[in-house]
Amino acid sequence: MIKVIGTMFRALAVVIGFLSVAGCSPREPDVPPDLFYLFATYPVGKNPTSVATADFNQDGFTDLITTNISDDSLSLLFGNGDGTFRAHVRLSVSKEPRSLALNDYNGDGLTDLAVACSGSDQIALFFGNANGSFGRGQKYNVYRSPISVTSGDLNGDHKPDLVAALRNDKIAVFLGNGDGSFTRGPQYEYGDTPTSVALADLNRDGNLDLAVSNGGPMSSAVSIWIGNGDGSFREPTDYRTGKRPLAVTFADFNNDGITDLLVINGQKDSFTTFLGNGDGTFQAGTDSGADAGPVHGLAGDFNGDRLADVAIVNIQSHNLSIVYGRGDGTFGYPPKNYRVKRGPFYIAPLHLRTGATEEPGLVTANNAASSISVFLHRGLKSRT
C-alpha cells in the first residue's frame, strides 16, 4: 500500500508481468571487442560509494568527485585534461555521505552538489565557486537514512528539484526555489527499501517521471511513478525485476526512440531491461547475465554502432563488465570483463577533452580499495 504523507489518497500497486531470460537462447557465444583499458587509479577518501564528473573549476577539463562513506568526506580531483588527475582535495560533510546529485541549484551557472548523508539523516547542499571550491549551504533533515538522490525540474518552473530515496520505505521530494534553497514537497511511503532513484519523461507529456528500485527482501521490483508536473506523482506501478535490485537508469535499447529501463540486480548476477511503450508503461523484463555481485551500471554506445550497451561494476568479482547491445533489447554474452581494484561500487561516464579532441571513458569508485579507476577507450575519439 502506498501512503502519501500529508495528502489523502492511498492506492495499491500493480505488479506487472514476468521475467524472460535472455541466456536461454541457443545462439553461439559472442566474442566481445576489447575496447577499454585501465589508464590510472587514484586514492580518494575511505570507502567511496559514488563518483560524478563535471568541470568544477571552469578550466575546460573534466574533474571528479566522490562520496566517501567511512570518513564523512567528499574527494575532489581536478583533471589535467589528459586522463590524469591531481591529488584529491578533501571536503568534510555530514555523516556517511552515500550519493550526490549535481546541478546548478542557485542559478549562478556553476555546478553545485546535493549530498545524501545516510548517517546524519540529511540532504546537504554545497554551492560551487568558479575556482573549484565549494561553499556550504543548508542541510535538510529527512527521516531516515537517505540512500540515493537525483535532481530534475519536477514542476515546470525551470528550477532544479530533488528526489531522495530513504531507507525506511519513503520517497522525499524537495522543490527548488532557484536560489539554492528548497521547499519540502510531498513525501511518499511505499515499497521495500528503495535503493536508487532516476528521473525521465516516460510518457512524453513533458513532465518528469520517477523510477525507484526496491531492494528489500519483500520486494524485487522497480516502481514507476508518473509525474503530474507539479512536483507530485501518481500511484506507482511495480514491475518485477531480478533479485535485490540496487540501481536503475534509462536508455533506448531497441532503437525505437522510446525510453527503456535498466535495473542492476545485486543477487543472481544479472541485470534486467524493460522496453518502454512510450506511454509510461513497460513490457515484461528480460534478464541478462553479468558477473559476480553487480551493484551499479549505466548505458552508453561503447563501440560506435549507435546501439546502447551496458557497463556494470561487480563487487564480488572485482571487475567492470561491458555488455554490447544488439539493438533489439537483447545483449551479447559473455561480457567483456576488466579487472578493477577491490570492491568496485559505482560507475560514471567520463569524457576527457584535450584541445579539440574528446575521448570517452569510464570511472569506477572502488569501495574496498578507497580509490577510483579511470578506463579510457582504445578508439573512439571525436573532434569537438
Regions found by a protein language model. Name each.
Residues S70-D72, G119-D121, N168-D169, G216-S219, ...:
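Short glycine/acidic-enriched loop and turn motifs that connect beta-strands
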Residues G60-T62, G109-T111, H158-P160, G206-L208, ...:
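Glycine-aliphatic tripeptides that mark coil-to-beta-strand junctions in extracellular
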Residues T49-Q58, F78, R98-Y105, I147-G156, ...:
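Beta-propeller blade termini
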Residues R10-S20:
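Bacterial N-terminal signal peptides
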Residues C24-K46, F78-K95, F127-R144, L175-D192, ...:
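Blade-edge motifs of beta-propeller repeat domains
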Residues F345-T384:
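Blade-level signature of beta-propeller repeat domains, shared across WD40, Kelch, NHL, RCC1
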Residues L64-T67, L113-A116, L162-A165, L210-N214, ...:
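Hydrophobic beta-strand segments that make up the repeating blades of beta-propeller
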